[in-house]
Amino acid sequence: MASIPVIVKHQGKKHEVEVDTTSNGETFKYQLFSITGVEPERQKIIVKGGQLKDDADMSKLGLKSGQTLMMMGTPSGDNTNVIEKPKEKIKFLEDMDEAEAAQLEGATPAGLQNLGNTCYMNSTLQVLRSVPELQEELLRYADSGAGSSSSANALSQLGLGGLGASMDLTGSLRDLFKQMGETQQGFPPLMFLNALRTAFPQFAQKAKDGHGYAQQDAEEAWSQIVAQLRQKLQIKNESDAEKNADVSWIDKYMAGKFETVMECDEPAAKEMGEESVVGEDTFFKLNCHINVETNHLRDGLTAGLKEQIEKNSEVLGRNAVYTKTSKISRLPVHLPVHFVRFDWRRDTNKKAKIMRKVTFPDELDAIEFCTDTLKKQLIPVRDKIRDVRKEELDLERARKRQKRMKAGEENDSDPLAQKEPLQKKKEAAAKKEEASKPAELAEEIEYKTDAQIEAERAASILAAKKEVLSLVSPELAADDGANQTGLYELRGVITHQGASADSGHYTSFVKKQGAKDPVTGKRKAEDGKWWWFNDDKVSEVEAERIQTLAGGGQSHSALILLYRAVPLPVVDEDVEMS
């Protein structure tokens, strides 16, 4: 008996099967029935030429050793009730300790206790913690107080985990994030707060009334923490240009670059031969400037890329006004955006809040703010990515539609009464279409099955994904810390409620990640919901809540947005669609 080893992919699992080339399709289906429990009549197996038929000659399918085939179908109700012994011992929630319960899929994340006007810090930390790559890099960080981990564990058992962290700010952040991952309760960030105040005394200022510490600006806390991480988190650069050279993690994943041009506003300076000054700047956030004409984030970002500076002009021999224009030459993977909502007022000696409503998108296209060179690299990739996402959305909608129709047919208790009108419509449409075609042509028409149509769509999406990857310039492909699509998705928001930066209340919103598939390890589609962190209170909110954070009063207004680059598509070539 001649046999060919193939791999059959079904519901995320891969099965190794020996195909008897002397048998037919029905025999092969019974083989798969013994492995998957899906009855032959409920199987849809995609092979060359379409769907595998029962009478197909397996020797004529052109199967190759190691080839992957895709199988669709689920067992009927008779088989779904078969009870199998679980592979792992089941552990119930009441039998788990706090750390195990906190790490369950879908568990509510830990909040942070307010230690006296520390909501500015709590909201900042929750959004920073939403960056998974940062958490991973912090775990690799070793500070001078690395030996404190045992004492930290001991204090944690006494409910004083926040006291056992490192005095180094970066090490303290590492310890805090780790401890937050082991509880669902409001955690006291005592040691991190002490480390923050030691490193930056401005956060240790006392309140003017003498009671406790003063409220602080969350944007200042964000900037100072990021500056410290930039100094401490050093990694090896894997790009070809600077192989193995030390680079800051922040510079690689959260820093962008501007190309700048500065020129004098007075025509006399140009007439006397003064040339424009071209330069390069590094940025760690984009500023959204707000004025009477700012209605959308795009307006504020555009305004923030032009700046007027008064400085000495050598050719004029006096001070003159210069305009500095910036264009982005590098977009980072993680992009913070700061709404410049606070303006210093001399009459009150306070940072007054600009209440104007400024809307912001869930998906940000940053290409319009880039240099012409970067635009040429990103536009083809962005346009093709949008095509791919549209095709994937259409395919997903078609699958859901088919599933609903199938469920409706299976649950229909009176087929004649329920389906007769629809059946008559289908028959009438088929007769009308048949009558409009020549008789000899009608005989040659071959109708495609749903599985064949789906396979063709999947093949089209696969080809489009490959095309996207081919459009990425070598320069961008070598920089894995840069945005390679030009598109961003919103992942976190820090908000402020109140009239000034030194008063009011800060909270944060972080988008929920999709559940992780235990078989493949990949994350499933997200449900679109968000976590709202209000100090130690954590609740789940709908996506519509985020659009209410545009401002327009003293209510919760977005202060910092954290965007993450839309990644390049992943090409799964396990399944042959040819």
Question: Could you tell me what each predicted segment is?
Answer:
Residues 1-578:
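UBL (ubiquitin/ubiquitin-like) substrate-recognition surfaces
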